[in-house]
Design a protein with these regions (language model features):
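Non-catalytic scaffold segments within catalytic domains of secreted glycoside hydrolases
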Residues: 1-156
């Protein structure tokens, strides 16, 4: 992270580092989608949390990473979720992970009838894909993921 954001991150004293290093009980993760990234030339703006990276919704061939939703930034891609779980596990010494929020919006959902809203095949597909990806991360990749909370109507 320091490589990406440089001096925009605070510096810890050795005492502060010793205090926080290894002190977490679990890793809580909100996740909705994944993105492609590419290097961006020049210096990033001071408030640009991506540093010198550009976040993209399609690959070099112009293929979208996932289907459109009501939220322009949210494109479901469950494989990216699994890869991120594995990366976090490898990077941080296999911490216990709880997915504290995960979900999607549906393109055009504000215009649907009650009957159409109740027959929500898109979210059924989304949760099946994401829960399966999480289960695969646990069983095949050795990720210590222990809990999952869905993004629901109670969150907004």
């Amino acid at each position: 992270m320091r490589k990406q954001l440089g001096d925009r991150l605070p510096k810890f004293t050795p005492e502060q580092r010793a205090l926080v290093q290894g002190s977490n009980d679990f890793y809580g993760m909100n996740h909705y989608c994944a993105n492609y990234i590419k290097h961006k030339s020049g210096e990033p703006e001071p408030q640009d949390y991506l540093g010198n990276l550009e976040s993209l919704l399609s690959n070099k061939a112009g293929q979208d990473i996932g289907p459109e939703t009501q939220s322009p930034w949210l494109r479901p891609y469950a494989i990216g979720f699994r890869k991120l779980l594995k990366w976090i596990s490898d990077r941080y010494g296999r911490p216990t992970i709880y997915v504290t929020e995960n979900g999607t919006s549906l393109k055009g959902e504000n215009d649907l009838s009650k009957e159409e809203i109740l027959e929500d095949d898109f979210r059924v597909w989304y949760f099946k894909e994401y829960v399966t990806a999480m289960a695969d991360a646990y069983t095949s990749d050795g990720v210590d993921v222990r809990g999952y909370m869905a993004w629901s109507l109670m969150d907004k």
